[in-house]
Amino acid sequence: MDTELLKTFLEVSRTRHFGRAAESLYLTQSAVSFRIRQLENQLGVNLFTRHRNNIRLTAAGEKLLPYAETLMSTWQAARKEVAHTSRHNEFSIGASASLWECMLNQWLGRLYKNQDAHTGLQFEARIAQRQSLVKQLHERQLDLLITTEAPKMDEFSSQLLGYFTLALYTSAPSKLKGDLNYLRLEWGPDFQQHEAGLIGADEVPILTTSSAELAQQQIAMLNGCTWLPVSWARKKGGLHTVVDSTTLSRPLYAIWLQNSDKNALIRDLLKINVLDEVY
């Protein structure tokens, strides 16, 4: 039996009006009437008596009512349980493109190597801007956010994972800032507050991107420089620090909902080092 037919039957019995039932179910009145006829044909009985606007349950309808309520309640419970089981095996992690490319990609590999403790766990690596990911976290569409900024909402829990160092890199040795075009790699709003002092107040980026891979590939072609994590740049090779530049230490945080049903799992996963070099 189609559960939608029972749902329609229950709504008509509640409102005693085909028009109001149609509005509640976001259907046309003719669609509601058609569903009731289908159910009556399947059961071989009339479920309602219709006298103008006076709609009443027949004796057969009265007998069906408690069974329909039980069936719909059981169906809803089954759907919820199945959905919870499916969702329970999924774990979504969100971060910016640059964080995934420079450090989280390696961490994800370590999570899979340690899957014995979490057999069957399905990871989703989600890439987006921080503002979008915070919204997803708040709406329970994301389990864990990795970011360079501490949370600003009371309903979030957080853990400082460590620090990493950014340095200004270019593709050739012995270069000065004044000789190079600036490529802005987005490391968060709080980094941008210091950016002008680190680069030069009048320096206009020739390119802005959230991808470290893209920025690294473009600096040679654009005679440019960009801020990259030191450990990642060393592994890449072929990169040189700009002579008259400094380094900058950045924090890395894990953020999740305080009342998340995956609190224990999150803390367990965070025991596996996110950063290759933690200090």
Swiss-Prot record:
Q: Which GO terms describe its biological process?
A: negative regulation of DNA-templated transcription
| Record-annotated DNA-binding residue ranges | 18-37
Q: Which UniProt keywords apply?
A: DNA-binding, Repressor, Transcription, Transcription regulation
- Keyword check for Nucleotide-binding, yes or no: no
Q: Respond yes or no to whether keyword DNA-binding is given for this record.
A: yes
Sequence similarity: Belongs to the LysR transcriptional regulatory family.
Q: Tell me, what does this protein do in biology?
A: Negatively regulates the transcription of the flagellar master operon flhDC by binding to the upstream region of the operon.
According to UniProt, the name of this protein is: HTH-type transcriptional regulator HdfR
